[in-house]
């Protein structure tokens, strides 16, 4: 029985990784608004991978594109931590599994992979709209079970050994692992701070990192979104992080 369950989980993960899930048009409601900013941003229909890119999938990419191998990538495009958990340029080794989500990848590398697959990185609006969907409806904030589960995910430290991508519970669209597995790059990850230098904009810094302090108890479902925005605001495109991966999106 255990073997059967294991095989079923592996097949489920493989199917989820391979699938692009169609997402209908909708709206994204930004957390941080300027005086003249719209309260809602229209999001056109698109498709997004059901699960993050795995080590095995990224290995295929670097084998086909030598300039993105660990020893050959330019430091302009990835810092010293790039693919540090792999055993070599084209060898995963024993520290990671082919089915786990790839991490230690820069925004430049993630963008190149997505283009290689004929797609792109999802925009922040797209990613957040899909991530806001619950298990049974497109508005997860209205699902107590979903809100509780997401809060638990963000309060729990990441495991030392990541599980296989694509094994988390799917949301109403059929997308998995948006919460509780790894952080994910978006195509415009730094869009919240491009209007100024965050190092000198203390007001913006307070808004990004302390904004949750102004949210009442009824809005606790927003805390994970504040965490994501705070994390994104700290990134630069060449950065690599041990729990930062990505997934691919495509236009219709």
Task: State where each predicted segment sits.
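Mature N-terminal segment immediately following signal peptide/propeptide cleavage
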Residues: 20-27
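Sec-dependent signal peptide recognition
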Residues: 2-9
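Active-site microenvironments of metalloenzymes and redox enzymes
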Residues: 42-146, 250-252
